[in-house]
Amino acid sequence: MLLWLAEYLQQYISAFAVVKYLTFRAILGVMTALGLSLLLGPWVINKLNKLQIGQSIRDDGPESHLVKSGTPTMGGTLILFAIVFATLLWSDLTNRYVLAVLFVTLSFGLVGWVDDYRKVVQKNSKGLPAKWKYFWQSLAGFTVAYGLYVTAQIPEETTLYIPFFKGVALELGVFYIILTYFMVVGFSNAVNLTDGLDGLAIMPTVMVGSALGIIAYLVGNANFSAYLQIPYVPGAGELVVYCAALAGAGLGFLWFNTYPAQVFMGDVGALALGAALGIIAVIVRHEIVFIIMSGIFVMETVSVILQVASFKLTGRRIFRMAPLHHHFELKGWPEPRVIVRFWIITVMLVLFGLATLKLR
């Protein structure tokens, strides 16, 4: 939004030309989102407390979690507001990739908001019925997948690139829509499953989102992409602003979500952030690298799948409790230890993922 104003004012004051630079707008984006999160956080938490929008805790979960009952939830609305506001302020709103990511963020955020509202306000323990939750997620996922497919301007936009190997790629054709759907819906639910401990989901989200911002900047630059021998996707660099806003909003939220949490993000935050990461990974054509960097989200999801499959087939559980973070809690690990160790794992995976950009 301010980019348009700066372009107009540039003809009178040349200093406004600096606003055109992606790095400058990314810095302003992270500062704007971080500032909004920190400033509005106390007000949001107080408002949620007054409205008695508190988290209910499962009776069959770890006993240490019972003290969390009543902690304000739906704090993801703060994250999404900060991200969307900063993105609208500092990004190029004519860029179709920015619009696609904003659509995914808001649509999945709405699904999560309805689910949270039914649980904590209407006191419906099941929230939004699973079939309807997946229906609306699928509708949004297929919509953005189809939209990106039919508006693709170059073959690189719908090609799957394999890391580590130079020139190894698969033209997906219509299967691009299917891949995009699973990336968006799958990681939306993966982040939601991970969001079970204080700060456990938001910090890996910030780290992976920041790494995707770096990748977006590189693939959106013809010189850098040619040097690194990675796909060049014109316009993808504009997502740096969104990723910066995500990092800022996430860090601001972590200020209040760190152990012991003053607020939880709820489904409104987790579903939206996971879906946003998934669609950005697709746009920048680094799906496999993204899956590597998101190893924590993948492990949490796989642990649930294995647990359910094992119990249905054999009547036995593989883990003491799923998702995986609860397994370690029941083994006696204090919650902060589980959280920080999962963060450390994410740091290593993100660094490895970024290193693959040079490994060919």
UniProtKB/Swiss-Prot annotation:
Keywords: Cell cycle, Cell division, Cell inner membrane, Cell membrane, Cell shape, Cell wall biogenesis/degradation, Magnesium, Membrane, Metal-binding, Peptidoglycan synthesis, Transferase, Transmembrane, Transmembrane helix. GO terms for cellular component: plasma membrane. Coiled coil: none annotated. Pathway: Cell wall biogenesis; peptidoglycan biosynthesis. InterPro entries: Glycosyl_transferase_4, PNAcMuramoyl-5peptid_Trfase, PNAcMuramoyl-5peptid_Trfase_CS. This is Phospho-N-acetylmuramoyl-pentapeptide-transferase. The gene is mraY. The keyword Cell inner membrane applies. It is a multi-pass membrane protein. Its cofactor is Mg(2+). The chain crosses the membrane at residues 26-46, 70-90, 97-117, 134-154, 167-187, 199-219, 236-256, 263-283, 288-308, 338-358. Its main location: membrane. It is found in: Cell inner membrane. Pfam families: Glycos_transf_4, MraY_sig1. Catalyzes the initial step of the lipid cycle reactions in the biosynthesis of the cell wall peptidoglycan: transfers peptidoglycan precursor phospho-MurNAc-pentapeptide from UDP-MurNAc-pentapeptide onto the lipid carrier undecaprenyl phosphate, yielding undecaprenyl-pyrophosphoryl-MurNAc-pentapeptide, known as lipid I. One of its GO terms (molecular function) is metal ion binding. Its EC number is 2.7.8.13. Disulfide bonds: none annotated. Belongs to the glycosyltransferase 4 family. MraY subfamily. It catalyses: UDP-N-acetyl-alpha-D-muramoyl-L-alanyl-gamma-D-glutamyl-meso-2,6-diaminopimeloyl-D-alanyl-D-alanine + di-trans,octa-cis-undecaprenyl phosphate = di-trans,octa-cis-undecaprenyl diphospho-N-acetyl-alpha-D-muramoyl-L-alanyl-D-glutamyl-meso-2,6-diaminopimeloyl-D-alanyl-D-alanine + UMP. One of its GO terms (biological process) is peptidoglycan biosynthetic process.
